[in-house]
């Protein structure tokens, strides 16, 4: 029994260290690449290539004064960062970095991840409500609206993968991918990545902390370590959705020659680079556009993906893989083009009475 607890403690320390180091690396990579996209060098003073800049920023946040608003609900205000941060860390318990390299191999792993990830929004709402600030509360309400709008297409996109594998275990889903599911489920991958970016409030869906509208949104009144926890939470969520996308659609740790962990990290970095590219390319949407995109565009596409997956399983179980991949990619582009004709993003002036 003692050996079990020792192994558990060691794995938890390694996992926590991996997440923290990855978050610091992600922050540095994002700032460097955003700088390149904007024709500037990015951070390049603190250490070689600016590698020490995230560490310097972390130290700065830790020594900042911890300010608590006078009229805030102090207990809830203090607890909110923990309620938001801890569930994100718990998500990594069921993500396999290699065959069996996970804290616990749950037979309902993906269901566990979806359930735990939903708790984060409670922490965000606690922060917005307890701050006694209209900007914080507005940011929190936007979070609730986005969570409701994008959780459904997110779950439906994952359901397509579950239908192909017949398992909810993350480890079994990876082993079932003799061909990466991004080729067999291209539409599901598109819906998952779009909905996941909206759920973690990345550009162009970053309305809950839109600086030009509501200052910093739900964490406007936070400073010091509490603000640092929210900042860590945001980038840990990016790492989590990249790891989940890698597991469900990119074959997880599988790949030739290199060590499985190296393959896993490489695929996670590819997803993260794509998220950075989207941030540097697409402007922030309005709140009505974000809601419409989820309900009028992603939800029908996710339902269509389920119907297509069910048809392929029942009617064409022995179809040549290359032909199936070609059909799926063609259907994906066709459906996106079709629904984009019906769905209008909106724009121009909006009259306010």
From Swiss-Prot:
Q: Which residues form a coiled coil?
A: none
Can you provide one Gene Ontology molecular function annotated for this UniProt record?
NADH dehydrogenase activity
Cellular component GO terms held in the UniProt record: plasma membrane
Q: What class of enzyme is it?
A: translocase
| Entries under InterPro entries matching the protein | NADH_UbQ_OxRdtase_su1/FPO, NADH_UbQ_OxRdtase_su1_CS
Keywords assigned: Cell membrane, Membrane, NAD, Quinone, Translocase, Transmembrane, Transmembrane helix, Ubiquinone
Q: Which reaction does it catalyse?
A: a quinone + NADH + 5 H(+)(in) = a quinol + NAD(+) + 4 H(+)(out)
Topology of this chain in the membrane: Multi-pass membrane protein
Span of the signal peptide:
none
Alphabetical GO biological process terms: aerobic respiration
Q: What is its EC number?
A: 7.1.1.-
Annotated compartments:
Cell membrane
For this protein, the parts annotated as crossing the membrane are: 8-28, 75-95, 108-128, 148-168, 178-198, 229-249, 258-278, 297-317, 319-339
The lineage's top-level taxon is: Bacteria
Q: NCBIfam families given for it?
A: PRK06076.1-2 (NF004741)
Described by its record, this protein's role is as follows:
NDH-1 shuttles electrons from NADH, via FMN and iron-sulfur (Fe-S) centers, to quinones in the respiratory chain. The immediate electron acceptor for the enzyme in this species is believed to be ubiquinone. Couples the redox reaction to proton translocation (for every two electrons transferred, four hydrogen ions are translocated across the cytoplasmic membrane), and thus conserves the redox energy in a proton gradient. This subunit may bind ubiquinone.
User: What subunit structure does UniProt give?
Assistant: NDH-1 is composed of 14 different subunits. Subunits NuoA, H, J, K, L, M, N constitute the membrane sector of the complex.
PANTHER family cross-referenced by the UniProt entry: NADH DEHYDROGENASE SUBUNIT 1, NADH-UBIQUINONE OXIDOREDUCTASE CHAIN 1
Write out the similarity annotation: Belongs to the complex I subunit 1 family.
Q: From the Swiss-Prot or TrEMBL record, give the protein name.
A: NADH-quinone oxidoreductase subunit H
**According to the entry, what is the taxonomic lineage of the organism?**
Bacteria, Bacillati, Chloroflexota, Dehalococcoidia, Dehalococcoidales
Gene name tied to this protein:
nuoH
